[in-house]
Design a protein with these regions (language model features):
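A structural signal for short loop-to-beta-strand junctions that line the ligand-binding cleft
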Residues: 72-77, 95-131, 147, 158-159
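Short beta-strand->loop
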Residues: 28-31, 117-121, 133-136, 141, ...
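Mature extracytoplasmic/periplasmic domains
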Residues: 260-320
Length: 343
C-alpha cells in the first residue's frame, strides 16, 4: 500500500473517530424555515454540539414521540403554537427543568407553568394575529377590534382560513378567555354571518384575497405580511399597496400573540445539551436572528434588531394572558365552532 493511500485511510479514520466523539443533539422541529439553518450552525460553532434534525409538522412530531415512547432519540422539541406545546405537556411528552437564564429572559406569560420543578416549555419568538383590510372598501375604525369583525357593518366582507386551523383556534381561545364562553360563541356566530366566502387557503391567500377585492377583511399572522413587505416581487408589492393593517384591541386587552417554543423531550438522553440549546435560543444573537431571519418578534424584550418590515409594522400593545390558556380553551372552542358552523 502506498504512503499516500495509507495517509488518506488514516485521515479518514481520524475524521470518523472525531465525528463519533462530537456530541450530538437530536432535534425534532416543526419550524420549516430554511433561514433557521444558520441558527443551528451558529450553535454548533459555539458549542461543538452537532445537531441531528427531524423535520415534521406539529401533529406528526407529537405522534412520533408517542409511538417511540422511551426509545425516542429526541432531546429537544420545537413547535410553533402555544396550544400544541400545552397539549404535548399534558400528554407527558416533555420534562420540567430549571433554568435561571430562561426564567430571567422569557416572560412568565410566554412559558409553561412552573409546578416547583421548573417549566416544561418556553416561547422564543412571537407573532401577532392582525387584521388586514382593503383600503377602498373598509375603514380602519371598522376593524380596530376583534369584536368588530362580527358587526353587521362588516357583513359579506370577511375571509379567513379554516376555523379549526391552530392559528385560529389559538386566537379564538384567547378571545374566549377575554370575553367568556357565551359572548365568545356569539362573536364566532357573527364571524360566520359576515363571511364573504367559505373559509379556505392559508394566511397569504387571505391577504391576496383582500387586495384583489374578493374580501374586504382578512386575518393573518404578521410574519406572512412581513414576507410580502420584504419581497422584491412586483406582484407582492402591489398587494401590500392595496391593503391596510390593524393591530386590534389597542384600547383594551391588546392584540393576540402566539409563540414558537421549545422543550426538552421526556426521554431525552442529552438533557444538559438540550438545556444548553434552549438557553442559546434565548441569547441576544439568536433572538435577533428570529426577527431578522424569519420576521418574528423576539420573546426577550428590549433587544435591537434590523428588520425594516417589522419596524414599519411598528410597536403595539400585545395581550399578556398566559399563552397556555389557548390550549386549555381549545376543546370548548372547537365545540363552539361546530355549533355555529365555522368550518
Amino acid at each position: 500500500m502506498s504512503f499516500v493511500r495509507r495517509a488518506a485511510l488514516a485521515a479518514g479514520l481520524l475524521w470518523a473517530l472525531c465525528a463519533q466523539a462530537q456530541p450530538v443533539l437530536n432535534l425534532y422541529s416543526a419550524r420549516h424555515y430554511q433561514t433557521d439553518e444558520a441558527l443551528y450552525a451558529n450553535f454548533t460553532k459555539a458549542t461543538g454540539i452537532r445537531i441531528q434534525r427531524v423535520d415534521a409538522d406539529d401533529a406528526g412530531i407529537l405522534a412520533r414521540l408517542k409511538a417511540e415512547g422511551s426509545a425516542s432519540p429526541a432531546d429537544v422539541i420545537l413547535l410553533v403554537d402555544a396550544a400544541r406545546l400545552w397539549k404535548a405537556e399534558t400528554e407527558g411528552l416533555f420534562q420540567p427543568f430549571k433554568s435561571a437564564t430562561l426564567q430571567k429572559r422569557i416572560p412568565a406569560h410566554l412559558r409553561g407553568k412552573d409546578d416547583g420543578q421548573g417549566s416544561q416549555w418556553f416561547g422564543f419568538s412571537t407573532r401577532a394575529r392582525v387584521v388586514v383590510y382593503n383600503k377602498t372598501a373598509v375603514q380602519p375604525g371598522d376593524v380596530d377590534s376583534y369584536e368588530k369583525l362580527a358587526d353587521a357593518r362588516n357583513k359579506g366582507k370577511l375571509c379567513t382560513r379554516s376555523g379549526s386551523h391552530p392559528y385560529n383556534l389559538s386566537l379564538f381561545g384567547a378571545v374566549t378567555e377575554h370575553l367568556g364562553p357565551q359572548k365568545a360563541e356569539a362573536w364566532m356566530q357573527g364571524l360566520v354571518n359576515n363571511m364573504a366566502r367559505a373559509p379556505k387557503g392559508g394566511d397569504t391567500d387571505q391577504i391576496k384575497a383582500v387586495a384583489s377585492g374578493e374580501c374586504g377583511i382578512g386575518i393573518t399572522n404578521t410574519y406572512y405580511l412581513a414576507r410580502l413587505m420584504r419581497s422584491k416581487s412586483v406582484d407582492d408589492q402591489a398587494v401590500m399597496e392595496k391593503i391596510g393593517v390593524v393591530f386590534p384591541n389597542q384600547n383594551s386587552w391588546g392584540t393576540h400573540i402566539n409563540i414558537a417554543g421549545g422543550a426538552i423531550a421526556k426521554h431525552a438522553k442529552n438533557v444538559e445539551a438540550a438545556q444548553q440549546f434552549l438557553e442559546y435560543l434565548a441569547s441576544d444573537a439568536a433572538q435577533a436572528y428570529f426577527a431578522n431571519g424569519n420576521n418574528e418578534w423576539p420573546a426577550v424584550s428590549g433587544l435591537d434588531f434590523s428588520n425594516p418590515a417589522l419596524e414599519k409594522l411598528g410597536k403595539f400593545k400585545s395581550e399578556t394572558i398566559p399563552v397556555s390558556v389557548v390550549g386549555m380553551n381549545q376543546v370548548k372552542v372547537q365545540q363552539m365552532l361546530d355549533r355555529v358552523g365555522y368550518r
